[in-house]
UniProtKB/Swiss-Prot annotation:
The lineage of its organism: Bacteria, Pseudomonadati, Pseudomonadota, Gammaproteobacteria, Alteromonadales. It comes from Shewanella loihica (strain ATCC BAA-1088 / PV-4). The gene is hemA. The keyword Lipid biosynthesis does not apply. Catalyzes the NADPH-dependent reduction of glutamyl-tRNA(Glu) to glutamate 1-semialdehyde (GSA). This is Glutamyl-tRNA reductase. The record marks 95 as: Important for activity. The keyword NAD does not apply.
Length: 416
C-alpha cells in the first residue's frame, strides 16, 4: 500500500467547482466510510473547507480515488481532472504538513486550517476510517504544525486588516481585557475584529450599526451590546478603542463629536482605527491631543511589512516540513520491512521445527544422541545459509559489487 492524496483548492478551481466537490458536515461520516471501502486498508480522511477539498487514502490506486470523487458528486471526469492535484508517497506527507502549517493557505500562515484538519481527523476516527498509518500521519502532522508555529514567526505578524487593527490595539493597551470597545458597523470585517477582540479577552463591546437587527445578531454571538448610529455620542465617551468599518459615503465620527467625548473622558487617550473606504472618521480627529487615529492605509503598510516577514518565516517552515516528511517516510519504510522480517523468522522457525522433530523421532528409535545433535546442527546450518549463499554467489557472478556489499553487511561479514 502507498499513501495517495487528491484535491482541489482556491488555486486550482473556481468557487463554483469548489462548492460542487465540497462535503456537507452531516454527510461526511458516510462519505469517509464509502471512500474507505474502496481502499484495501480501509483508511481514508476527507478534509473539506470553503477553500479546499482533499482526500487522503492509504491505497495504491490513485485513479480509483478520483473515480470515487467524481461518482460521489456526480461530476464529469473532464470537469474535475484539470483542476485536481495528485500526490503519492512522501509528496502526500509533505503536502498535508504544508496545509496544516498554513503554508498552502490563501493567507500565508493563517492558523484556522490546522483546527479544520484536526476536526476532519476526529470525524474520520468517528467513522472508523483511521488505522495505524493514517493515525501516525495525522498525529505527526499536528506535531509538525506546532513545531512550525513555535520555531518560526509564520503566525506572529498580522496580515488581515481586522487582525492588524486588533494587533495595533494590543501594542497601545497593555491589557485589552480591561478596555471598552466601540465597533461601528456589523459587516464581515467588524465581525472578524470582534472575534479577534474576544479571543484577546475583551468582554466589554458595543456594536453600533445603521440596522439594529444586524448588530443584535452579531452581539448575540459575542456578548456585546447593540446600538444605533444615532446613539454613538452617548456611548463614545466610554470607549477606549473605536474601530469603524461601514459603507457610509460620509464620515460618521466628526472632530467635534470626538472632542466632546474626550472632554467627558477627562482627556484619557482614545484609539480610533478607521478601516472604512471612504473614511468613517474625519481626518481632523488626528489633530486632537488625546486621540490616536489610524486609517486603513496605516494598517496596509503594516500588513505589507508583516507579509514579507511571514514569507521569510515560511522559508524556514518549508525546511522543517521537508525534514519531518523524510522522518515519517523512514517510519513507513520500516513498516514495509516488518512483513519481510516476520516472514523470514517464520520460515526459519519452520525449518528448525521440522529438523528438531526428525531428530526427536530418531532419538526415540534409539539413535545415538551425540551423532543426532551434530546432524541437527549441520542440517540446520545448511538450511539457514542456503538462501544467503545463493544470493552471494549470484551477485558475484554478475559482478554486482553493490549488492555483494549489502549482502555482506546484512550477514555481518564486514565486522572488525
Amino acid at each position: 500500500m502507498s499513501l495517495v492524496a487528491i484535491g482541489i483548492n482556491h488555486k486550482t478551481a473556481t468557487v463554483d467547482l469548489r462548492e460542487k466537490v465540497a462535503f456537507a458536515p452531516d454527510k461526511i461520516h458516510e462519505a469517509m466510510k464509502s471512500l474507505a471501502s474502496r481502499t484495501k486498508t480501509g483508511e481514508a480522511v476527507i478534509v473539506s473547507t470553503c477553500n479546499r477539498t482533499e482526500l487522503y487514502c492509504n491505497t495504491g490506486d490513485e485513479a480509483d480515488v478520483i473515480s470515487w470523487l467524481e461518482s460521489y458528486h456526480q461530476l464529469s471526469h473532464d470537469d474535475v481532472l484539470p483542476c485536481l492535484y495528485k500526490y503519492q508517497g512522501q509528496q502526500v506527507v509533505q503536502h498535508l504538513m504544508r496545509v496544516s502549517s498554513g503554508l498552502d493557505s490563501l493567507i500565508l500562515g493563517e492558523p484556522q486550517i490546522l483546527g479544520q484538519v484536526k476536526q476532519s481527523f476526529v470525524k474520520a476516527k468517528e467513522a472508523g476510517t483511521v488505522a495505524v498509518t493514517m493515525d501516525r500521519l495525522f498525529q505527526n502532522t499536528f506535531s509538525v504544525a506546532k513545531k512550525v508555529r513555535t520555531e518560526t514567526e509564520i503566525g506572529a505578524a498580522a496580515v488581515s486588516v481586522a487582525f492588524a487593527a486588533v494587533s495595533m490595539a494590543k501594542h497601545i493597551f497593555s491589557a485589552l481585557s480591561a478596555t471598552k470597545v466601540l465597533l461601528i458597523g456589523a459587516g464581515e470585517t467588524i465581525e472578524l475584529v470582534a472575534r479577534h477582540l474576544k479571543d484577546n479577552g475583551v468582554d466589554s463591546m458595543i456594536v453600533a450599526n445603521r440596522t439594529i437587527s444586524r448588530a443584535e445578531a452579531m452581539c448575540e454571538e459575542f456578548g456585546a451590546t447593540a446600538i444605533t448610529l444615532e446613539q454613538i455620542p452617548d456611548f463614545l465617551p466610554k470607549a477606549d478603542i473605536v474601530i469603524s468599518s461601514t459603507a457610509s459615503p460620509l464620515p460618521i465620527l466628526g472632530k467635534g463629536m470626538v472632542e466632546k467625548a474626550l472632554k467627558q473622558r477627562r482627556h484619557q487617550p482614545m484609539l480610533l482605527v478607521d478601516i472604512a473606504v471612504p473614511r468613517d472618521i474625519e481626518a481632523e480627529v488626528a489633530d486632537l491631543d488625546d486621540a490616536f487615529l489610524y486609517t486603513v492605509d496605516d494598517l496596509q503598510s503594516i500588513i505589507e511589512q508583516n507579509m514579507a516577514s511571514r514569507r521569510e518565516a515560511a522559508e524556514k517552515a518549508e525546511l522543517i516540513v521537508e525534514e519531518e516528511s523524510h522522518h515519517f517516510m523512514e517510519w513507513i519504510r520500516s513498516l514495509e520491512s516488518v512483513d519481510s522480517i516476520r516472514e523470514y523468522r517464520s520460515q526459519s522457525m519452520a525449518i528448525r521445527d521440522e529438523l528438531v522433530e526428525r531428530a526427536i523421532n530418531k532419538l526415540a528409535q534409539g539413535g545415538d544422541s551425540e551423532q543426532l545433535i551434530l546432524e541437527l546442527a549441520n542440517k540446520l546450518t545448511n538450511k539457514l545459509i542456503h538462501a544467503p549463499t545463493q544470493a552471494l554467489t549470484q551477485a558475484s557472478r554478475r559482478g554486482d559489487l553493490n549488492s555483494l556489499g549489502q549482502l555482506r553487511a546484512a550477514l555481518g561479514l564486514d565486522k572488525d
